[in-house]
A protein has these predicted regions:
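N-terminal Rossmann-like NAD(P) cofactor-binding subdomain of oxidoreductases
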Residues: 1-205, 309, 333, 341-342
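C-terminal active-site/capping subdomain that shapes the small-molecule cofactor and substrate pocket
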Residues: 2, 236, 248, 252-342
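Short, solvent-exposed beta-strand edge segments and adjacent coil->beta transition regions
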Residues: 150-151, 207-209, 246-250, 314-316
Length: 342
C-alpha cells in the first residue's frame, strides 16, 4: 500500500528527502512505495522548485521539475504546495496523508508534533532529535524493531547519531564498550552565519567559513536512546568546519576487554557485509570528505584510521557520513519501517 507523505519544512533535509526518493528510480533501483502528496515550504513555489532542481552540494537533480499553479510537478507527479508557519492550517486529512515528515526543526516534541495528527495525518517522523515525550527514537538498521503499532510521533535522531549507532553496535556486541568520547568534525549548516553577527553563543556568533568552531552536540548521549546498554556512557562535542557537506565521527572508547586493530576491522567488515549492509559502509581507500558526498549510507567506517593502545583497551575509530544525503535516505528507510508496523 502506498504511503502518502507530506513534508513540513523544505530546507536541506526536506529537499534531499524528495530528491532521494526520486533518484532511486533514476539510479535503477525499484521505486519505494511512497508518494509525496504535499509540501509545506516557506516562500515562492518557483524558487523552491529551482532549489529542488539545482543544489550547490548535490548538483543537478536528474528529474523534471516544474510549477503548475499551487503544485510543484516532479516527473509528472503533482505535489500540492503550502506556505504557512502554522501547521494548523494544513489540510492533511483532506489529502489523505498517512505520514508527515517533520523537517522544520521546530516541532521536535510529541506535544508540538501532534498538531499534524490533529490535522488528519496518521503518524509523524521528526528529522531531528526528539524531546523526551516522543514515542520512540530510532536509527534504521539498528533499533527499528522497537517500533510499536501505537507509536504516533517518532524521532529519526540526528545525522550524527545515525552515523555513530551503526558504528558502535557491532563493537558493543563483540568487544564491549565501557565508555566513550566522540568528536564530530561537522560541515557547517545553515543555522550558522557567513559573517560575524551577534549571538548569545559567542562562538556561534563567528563566521562559519573562516574558522573551525567548537560547539555542543547531543548525538553522543542520544546513542543511549538507540542502544540502551550505552546510556550514560558516551559524551562528546562537535567541531564545525568550513566545508559545505560531509562530516566525520571520531570515537575513542574504553573496550571491555583487550582487542586489536585487526579484530576491530574484522568485526566492522563482517557487520557491513551482513546485518548492517547498506547502512554501515567499510572503506580502506585513502579518501577524503568530498569522496563521500551524496553517499546514501549513514555511516562509512574508515578502516585505515583505526588505532588501538598498547594494552588493547583504548580504541579509536573513524566513520564518514554525508550529513544531508545519508540522513535523508535514513528518513525514507525509517518512514517505511514506521508505517509497516501493524
Amino acid at each position: 500500500m502506498t504511503i502518502r507523505v507530506a513534508i513540513n519544512g523544505y530546507g536541506r533535509i526536506g529537499r534531499m528527502v524528495l530528491r532521494a526518493l526520486y533518484e532511486d528510480q533514476v539510479n535503477g533501483k525499484p521505486r519505494r512505495d511512497i508518494q509525496i502528496v504535499a509540501i509545506n515550504a516557506m516562500g515562492d513555489i518557483a524558487i523552491n522548485a529551482h532549489l529542488t532542481k539545482y543544489d550547490s552540494a548535490h548538483g543537478r537533480f536528474p528529474a523534471d521539475v516544474s510549477v503548475d499553479g499551487d503544485y510543484m510537478v516532479v516527473n509528472g507527479d503533482r505535489i500540492k504546495m503550502f506556505c504557512t508557519r502554522n501547521p494548523a492550517e494544513t489540510p492533511w486529512g483532506e489529502l489523505g496523508v498517512d505520514l508527515v515528515l517533520e523537517c522544520t526543526g521546530k516541532f521536535t516534541s510529541k506535544e508540538k508534533a501532534m498538531i499534524h495528527i490533529e490535522q488528519g495525518a496518521k503518524k509523524v517522523l521528526i528529522s531531528a532529535p526528539g524531546e523526551k515525550d516522543v514515542d520512540a527514537t530510532i536509527v534504521y538498521g539498528v533499533n527499528q524493531n522497537v517500533l510499536k503499532p501505537n507509536d504516533v510521533v517518532v524521532s529519526n535522531a540526528s545525522c550524527t547519531t545515525n552515523c555513530l549507532a551503526p558504528l558502535v553496535k557491532p563493537l558493543l556486541e563483540k568487544i564491549g564498550i565501557e565508555s566513550g568520547l566522540m568528536t564530530t568534525i561537522h560541515a557547517f549548516t545553515n543555522d550558522q552565519v557567513l559573517t560575524d553577527v551577534y549571538h548569545n553563543d559567542m562562538r556561534r556568533a563567528r563566521s562559519a567559513v573562516t574558522s573551525m568552531i567548537p560547539t555542543k552536540t547531543g548525538a553522543a548521549k542520544a546513542v543511549g536512546l538507540v542502544l540502551p546498554a550505552l546510556a550514560g556512557r558516551f559524551d562528546g562535542f562537535a567541531m564545525r568546519v568550513p566545508v559545505i557537506n560531509v562530516s566525520v565521527v571520531d570515537l575513542t572508547f574504553a573496550a571491555s576487554r583487550a582487542t586489536s586493530v585487526d579484530e576491530v576491522n574484522a568485526i566492522l567488515k563482517t557487520a557491513s557485509e551482513g546485518e548492517l549492509k547498506g547502512i554501515l559502509g567499510f572503506n580502506t581507500l585513502p579518501l577524503v570528505s568530498i569522496d563521500f558526498n551524496h553517499d546514501p549510507r549513514p555511516s562509512i567506517y574508515d578502516a585505515s584510521q583505526t588505532r588501538v593502545s598498547a594494552d588493547g583497551k583504548l580504541v579509536k575509530v573513524l566513520a564518514w557520513y554525508d550529513n544531508e544525503w545519508g540522513y535523508s535516505v535514513q528518513m525514507l528507510n525509517a518512514a517505511e519501517a514506521l508505517m509497516a508496523v501493524k
